[in-house]
C-alpha cells in the first residue's frame, strides 16, 4: 500500500493550502485512537472488583494531551487526576483543548505536570494508567523495572497500575499498513515500518490521509520494544507488586477483529493481532 496516498496532489495544490497542512494532529489522534470513557469504565470495573468501592484519584502517566485525566475529573465530582508527561507540546495542547473544556470546578481537580514519570511525585493514587503502549519506550529491563517501582511507590493501599499491551504475529512484520476511516473525509493510517526480531524492537507511524489527496505523514512515530505479557508480569513482580492479572480482548466471531470486551484470562489462543490490559496491585487479591 506504499505510495497510495500522495502527499499533495495537483488538484490539492490548485485549491490552495492542502487539508493536511490545516489539520490538527492532536485532535485527529484523540478522535482516531483514544476512548477515555471506555478506559474509565474498564478501570472502574477492575478496581471495584478488588476494593469494593470506586476509585477516586487517577494518575495518568505519559499523558500526552491528558484526555483521560480530564475525562476522569469530569466523570464524578469527587474525582481528581494528575497528568504527567515529559513533552511540553502535547501538555500545552491538552491544557487548551481538554482542560479548558472542563467546568471550572472540575478544572480545579486536574493538575498537569511536565516531568519524567519515574521521578515526579504526586499524592498516592488509586489508579495509575500507562495507556497507548506508552511504556514501550523503555527498551531495557532495568529501565522498565525502575518505572514500575516508581509507580508502585505512587499508589495508595489497594491501588492498581493499569497497562495496555499490543502483540501478535501481525505486529512483527514490515511494510504493512492498516487504513480506516475516522470521519470528515479523513483516513487513519497505521504503518509498521520496521521490525527487529533479535531485539523485539519495532518502528511504527501514524499518518492521516485527507479527501483532497494530501497526507499528514508521520504525524506520530513510535520506536518501541514489543514487550510480551510474561516479561511484563515478571518485571511487575520484581518491582514489588503483589499480583498482576491479564484482561484479554475478545475477538469478533468471523472477522477476528477486537470486540472491545475484555475478560480476565489465564490463557489465550494464538491471534494474529491482539490487545490486552494488565492490572497490577499493591496487595494480594481477595478472591
Task: Enumerate the predicted regions with their spans.
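A short glycine-rich, Lys/Arg-flanked "PGG" loop and its adjoining helix->strand segment in the class I
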Residues: 143-157
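SAM-dependent methyltransferase
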Residues: 162-235
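Conserved SAM-binding loop
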Residues: 94-95
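Conserved SAM-binding loop of SAM-dependent methyltransferases across substrates and taxa
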Residues: 65-78
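A short acidic, Gly/Pro-enriched loop at the edge of an enzyme's catalytic core
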Residues: 118-128
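Conserved class I S-adenosyl-L-methionine
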Residues: 54-64
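Conserved SAM-binding strand-loop segment of SAM-dependent methyltransferases
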Residues: 102-117
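C-terminal lobe and adjacent flexible extensions of AdoMet/dcAdoMet transferase-like proteins
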Residues: 223-287
Amino acid at each position: 500500500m506504499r505510495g497510495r496516498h500522495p502527499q499533495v496532489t495537483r488538484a490539492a495544490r490548485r485549491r490552495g493550502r492542502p487539508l493536511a497542512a490545516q489539520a490538527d494532529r492532536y485532535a485527529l489522534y484523540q478522535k482516531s485512537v483514544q476512548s477515555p470513557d471506555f478506559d474509565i469504565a474498564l478501570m472502574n470495573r477492575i478496581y471495584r472488583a478488588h476494593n469494593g468501592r470506586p476509585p477516586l484519584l487517577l494518575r495518568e502517566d505519559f499523558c500526552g494531551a491528558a484526555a483521560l485525566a480530564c475525562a476522569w475529573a469530569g466523570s464524578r465530582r469527587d474525582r481528581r487526576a494528575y497528568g504527567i508527561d515529559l513533552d511540553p507540546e502535547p501538555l500545552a495542547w491538552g491544557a487548551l483543548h481538554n482542560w479548558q473544556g472542563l467546568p471550572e470546578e472540575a478544572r480545579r481537580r486536574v493538575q498537569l505536570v511536565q516531568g519524567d514519570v519515574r521521578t515526579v511525585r504526586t499524592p498516592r493514587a488509586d489508579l495509575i494508567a500507562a495507556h497507548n503502549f506508552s511504556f514501550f519506550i523503555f527498551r531495557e529491563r532495568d529501565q522498565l523495572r525502575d518505572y514500575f517501582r516508581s509507580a508502585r511507590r505512587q499508589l495508595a493501599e489497594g491501588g492498581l497500575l493499569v497497562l495496555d499491551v499490543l502483540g501478535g504475529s501481525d505486529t512483527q512484520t514490515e511494510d504493512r499498513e492498516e487504513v480506516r476511516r475516522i470521519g470528515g473525509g479523513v483516513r487513519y493510517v497505521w504503518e509498521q515500518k520496521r521490525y527487529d526480531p533479535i531485539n523485539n524492537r519495532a518502528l511504527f507511524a501514524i499518518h492521516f490521509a485527507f479527501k483532497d489527496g494530501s497526507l499528514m505523514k508521520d504525524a506520530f512515530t513510535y520506536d518501541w520494544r514489543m514487550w510480551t505479557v510474561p516479561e511484563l508480569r515478571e518485571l511487575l513482580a520484581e518491582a514489588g507488586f503483589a499480583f498482576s492479572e491479564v484482561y484479554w480482548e475478545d475477538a469478533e466471531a468471523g472477522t477476528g477483529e477486537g470486540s472491545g470486551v475484555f475478560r480476565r484470562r489465564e490463557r489465550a489462543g494464538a491471534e494474529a493481532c491482539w490487545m490486552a490490559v494488565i492490572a497490577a496491585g499493591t496487595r494480594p487479591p481477595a478472591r
